A protein has these predicted regions:
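A conserved acidic beta->alpha catalytic loop
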Residues: 15-24, 73
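Catalytic donor-sugar/metal-binding loop of nucleotide-sugar-dependent glycosyltransferases
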Residues: 129, 152-156, 165-181
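C-terminal catalytic/acceptor-binding lobe
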Residues: 172-211
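Acceptor/aglycone-binding surface of glycosyltransferases and processive sugar-polymer synthases
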Residues: 41-60, 65, 77-158, 185-200
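Residues at the starts of beta-strands that form the adenosine-phosphate
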Residues: 10-11, 35, 65, 174
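Short, conserved SAM-binding/catalytic segment
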Residues: 28-33
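Short beta-strand/loop segment that forms part of the nucleotide-sugar
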Residues: 1, 8-18, 39-40, 69
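Residue-level signature of catalytic and energy-coupling elements of molecular machines
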Residues: 54, 72, 141, 168, ...
Length: 211
């Protein structure tokens, strides 16, 4: 949070009543900082739901650009600076692990291959030229979110990122990929599980057969 505040951004933390007492920590250290906000939800409702609520909060509060990024140190503040330099009122800026100069640090070879193949498969099914369909490091403009009708998205796992990418392309919103260095989380466990994988596969096959 301190690093983000140095680049003069407003911060929203979406907390699904987490057992690590996220709210208490944020309130203790940043309770008097008007640039740090926290949105508390009663229970765990999923990644996509958190983004939808976060986007709504941002738009309701008059922000023209909204950044989504992980809070576990996987996404780097220096990369955010690079993404912000490219922001555009009509485009989506996507932090990509799988373009030239993009990197992933700290993953096993198996996990790296699984992620790369999953992204390639997603691109193939949706006929997209985007290399990192599941990236959770993006800058959305107000225009792009309204054009996509983000509030009508259905997915809650990593399929949410694929769905948002597909909706952007189908609605004529340009996506610009910028290389980032993704670093494996410093603590905690990955949210990836079989339910999330099944949701993504279901979305992709439904999308393919509807076309």
């Amino acid at each position: 949070i301190d690093e983000l505040l140095e680049i003069k951004v407003n911060i929203l933390i979406v907390d699904d009543n987490s057992p690590d007492k996220t709210y208490d920590v944020v309130e203790k250290y940043f309770g008097n900082n008007e640039k740090v906000n926290i949105l508390i939800r009663e229970k765990k409702l999923g990644l996509g739901s958190a983004y939808r609520d976060g986007f709504k909060w941002g738009l309701d509060n008059g922000f023209e650009y909204l950044v989504e990024m992980d809070a576990d140190f996987s996404h780097q503040v220096n990369d955010l600076k690079a993404l912000l330099l490219e922001k555009d009122e009509k485009n989506i800026i996507l932090g990509s692990r799988y373009v030239s100069q993009g990197k992933v640090l700290g993953w096993s070879k198996r996990r790296s291959l699984l992620s790369k193949y999953a992204n390639n498969f997603s691109s193939f099914i949706t006929k997209s030229k985007i290399n990192d369909m599941t990236s959770g490091f993006r800058i959305y403009s107000k225009y792009s979110l309204e054009k996509i009708n983000y509030q009508n998205t259905k997915n809650n796992g990593y399929a949410f990122q694929i769905e948002m990418t597909v909706l952007a392309i189908n609605n004529g919103v340009k996506i610009i990929e910028i290389p980032i260095t993704f670093v494996e989380r410093e603590s905690g466990k990955s949210k990836m599980n079989s339910r999330i994988i099944i949701e993504a596969l279901k979305y992709l096959f439904l999308y393919r057969f509807k076309k």
